[in-house]
Amino acid sequence: MASIAASASISLQARPRQLAIAASQVKSFSNGRRSSLSFNLRQLPTRLTVSCAAKPETVDKVCAVVRKQLSLKEADEITAATKFAALGADSLDTVEIVMGLEEEFGIEMAEEKAQSIATVEQAAALIEELLFEKAK
């Protein structure tokens, strides 16, 4: 009966610790009632992702401001990954945290940027970005 052949290229991006694979020369054959699909696989180089973490000193200062603004005890653990909401902060508390950070670091945060922070790490990264821009 009829035979069909096609060629295509498919690329899958790798996640951490996984391989990227490309499928090329995809072929489909039909022989009466049975059909089969075959393709060749080859490994692609993995893509690197660069992420930048805030300086530990900045994170520590942010933690201190958050602790002060929310009246938290020293026993209450605050890390870079801590979400303000997990500490019981509502939207008003978050505004007060931002105001405290602006005062502590001598910066001004745009409202849309301030609304995007939800964790200590995000706040510290934004502060470092603003300090870098201010130093230019």
From Swiss-Prot:
The keyword Chloroplast applies. Residues 56-131 form the Carrier domain. GO terms for molecular function: acyl carrier activity; phosphopantetheine binding; protein domain specific binding. One of its GO terms (cellular component) is chloroplast. It is found in: Plastid, Chloroplast. The keyword Lipid biosynthesis applies. The modification O-(pantetheine 4'-phosphoryl)serine is found at residue 91. Keywords: Chloroplast, Fatty acid biosynthesis, Fatty acid metabolism, Lipid biosynthesis, Lipid metabolism, Phosphopantetheine, Phosphoprotein, Plastid, Transit peptide. Residues 1-51 form a transit peptide. It holds the Pfam family PP-binding. 4'-phosphopantetheine is transferred from CoA to a specific serine of apo-ACP by acpS. This modification is essential for activity because fatty acids are bound in thioester linkage to the sulfhydryl of the prosthetic group. Disulfide bonds: none annotated. InterPro entries: ACP, ACP-like_sf, ACP_chloroplastic, PKS_PP-bd, PP-bd_ACP, Ppantetheine_attach_site. Carrier of the growing fatty acid chain in fatty acid biosynthesis. NCBIfam families: acyl_carrier. Belongs to the acyl carrier protein (ACP) family. This is Acyl carrier protein 2, chloroplastic.
